[in-house]
């Protein structure tokens, strides 16, 4: 039986990394690439604030082709939808069978993605649905929402110390948007990515740690 050809929605963080790992262990799927939305004004991963250079290094460490979906800044819902639907229409013509997402719990997000693909022959796949992902890779906290999570955690390692220090009420996987991560090593990579932590800045109501390639420091 032929494997399903799939592409993975890649955020640069832990959930998409673990979704990749589950696919790598499966005999049902052939991973043909990853795709990511990038803020064209800053050349950074949307929401996570990770540099495109590091995004490319992740793809190289995984041995997978990367498709960048550029979105403007600021980006309206209409502009975002236009960019995503353009990508979907393009890959639907390339023999791709499905798109994989690392969503865990939120039904509304899952329904939104299913609706996006409903008119195509692409299948939406959720390989992590309902699974906890507390300790899955070596990651750094790239972004925090200071309304939910202390600013001091930006640039912190995602480890037992970090999890123990989280205030009550914060999801340990950051599934309510409390924080976002960058994966620099893990079972899904062929080799680790050398990084360092640069400036920590506050922008648009979020606190971002500028994660740098090690040689840039």
Question: What is each model feature region?
Answer:
Residues 1-217:
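Nucleotide-activated chemistry modules centered on ATP-dependent adenylation/adenylyltransferase
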């Amino acid at each position: 039986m032929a494997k399903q050809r799939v592409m993975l929605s890649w955020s640069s963080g832990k959930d998409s990394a673990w979704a990749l790992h589950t696919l790598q262990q499966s005999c049902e799927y052939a991973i043909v690439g990853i795709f990511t939305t990038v803020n064209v004004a800053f050349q950074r991963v949307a929401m996570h604030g990770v540099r495109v250079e590091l995004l490319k290094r992740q793809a190289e460490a995984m041995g997978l082709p990367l498709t960048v979906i550029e979105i403007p800044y600021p980006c309206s819902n209409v502009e975002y939808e236009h960019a995503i639907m353009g990508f979907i229409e393009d890959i639907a013509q390339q023999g791709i069978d499905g798109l994989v997402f690392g969503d865990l719990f939120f039904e509304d997000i899952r329904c939104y993605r299913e609706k996006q693909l409903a008119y195509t022959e692409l299948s939406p796949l959720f390989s992590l649905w309902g699974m906890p992902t507390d300790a899955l890779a070596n990651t750094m906290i790239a972004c925090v929402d200071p309304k939910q999570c202390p600013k001091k955690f930006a640039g912190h390692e995602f480890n037992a110390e970090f999890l123990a220090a989280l205030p009550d009420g914060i999801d340990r996987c950051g599934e309510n948007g409390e924080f976002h991560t960058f994966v620099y090593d893990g079972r899904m990579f062929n080799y680790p990515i050398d990084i360092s932590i640069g400036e920590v800045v506050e922008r648009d109501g979020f606190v971002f740690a500028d994660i740098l390639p090690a040689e840039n420091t």
